[in-house]
Amino acid sequence: MVKREQWGSRIGLILAVAGNAIGLGNFLRFPVQAADHGGGAFMIPYMISLILLGIPLLWIEWALGRFGSKKGHGTAVAVFDYLWKNPVAKYIGLLGVLIPLAVVVYYTYIESWTLLYSFFSLIGKLPSTPVTENVSDYLKPFSHFLVEKTGQDASGLFLTPALETYIFFVITLLINLYILYRGVSAGIEKVAKYAMPLIFVMAIILMIRVFTLSSPDGRNFLDGLGFLWNPDFSALTNPKVWLAAAGQVFFTLSVGFGAILTYASYIKPKDDIALNGLAGASVNEFAEVILGGSIAIVASVIFFGIPATAMIASNGAFNLGFMALPAIFANIPYGEFFSFLWFLLLFFAGVTSSIALCQPAIAFLEDELGFSRQKSVLALGIFLFIAAHIPIFIKGALDEIDFWVGTFGLVVFALFEAVIFFWIYNSKEAWKELTRDNDIKIPYFFYYIMKYIAPGLLIIILISWSIEMLPSQLTKTDPGAWIGRIFIVILTIIGFLLIKAAWGNRNGRTHT
């Protein structure tokens, strides 16, 4: 087995874990979800979901990762196999490798858009806004720009992205692979130490600029902050707001991806996980709620008002970040610079997340198949380059893959993590494993949250999503949707075969 790497410093670990969580979702998805679900009406369920679902699942993944570090393994494949003496366990654990791997196939492509936009902002090639009071017409040039660059206006099965879009995707992929090639400490950790402070500096500069904006109607930043933070207790009876809030907590903390488990496997077996996990989550929440919410939402409320902001958010996940904000920046002094800063911030945030999503696959190749770091990254790079052509060129494939692995799959895997650790393995042993050698004491009431409440909430989310989304998803018959499904099936079969090969060469080294 290849000797496993370790983090070089505690601050590097915390920044890397925070970088894993701080991604495009913090600055693109959170503002859209909050604006679409009533601003302050969204924040109460969000905070409750963070305590009852996000933090407990985060600590569970940290504990699973530290458990894996004792055994010399960094993915749920082997960790589940140790915890549950059943041949099926390792195949369930495969979700913790396949989900982040499938997500990063399209995530790096979306990430590359931000690099393209930052470059076009710098050279002044983004669209200008028309003179109109109609919000839809105001944003139309930026909507057309995104459609044109990604080829979404194609009428048939195949998309026709612009050449520069493809070039920026290749550049983005190569940047990710270079960082991964350097390793955990010299690559991921080193990048996090530079990228995370830069993300915060850029976000604070943008937030300060947004707070100085005003509209002819007299709206200012206080209106935007009021929309986000004034509580609406009537929303507590709206199940859709709760589901949206719980879903956002999943995305923002990166639970259910398996990446936290893998990152935690590179700590020493007696290192703290409680404080490290909480510190990483706190950095992430500051980036999302304070910075992410104070840029896109506040700017949009100032320029367009609350009803129009909610309308923009309801029309798509990219509308605030890729359309409303650049349109706003196009109409302020030095707007090109602030637009460049915004998209560069998104790119850095995207990179720190995408390299984390790649790491479980690399850890699997290293730990279970004995690949070297370089060989693992090369194999991963070839796969990602080939597989990314599906979401780049096939209409409907990206949305289909995103639903099954980037939405539904996250909840399924997180449920397996909680059930296997606290029910199948042994809840008392799980609690002992989770609370040992920590710098802070985890309150005992979290034992009941992790054993009963968190799994119960996950089941409720799964049932609700199944009722609300599965019927329409399963009835899709367009070729792009089927290509996305076939891709997931083929990836799963390859994963099963690799596990079979790895365990076949183990000579009884594990439980199966």
Name each model feature, range by range.
Residues 2-5, 33-37, 67, 72-95, ...:
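Inter-helical loop and helix-membrane interface segments of multi-pass membrane transporters/permeases
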Residues 12-17, 47, 93-97, 128-181, ...:
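Transmembrane alpha-helical segments of multi-pass small-molecule transport proteins
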Residues 5, 35-62, 164-165, 410, ...:
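Extracellular loop-to-transmembrane helix junctions
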Residues 2-11, 189, 193-351, 355, ...:
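Membrane-embedded translocation segments of transport machinery
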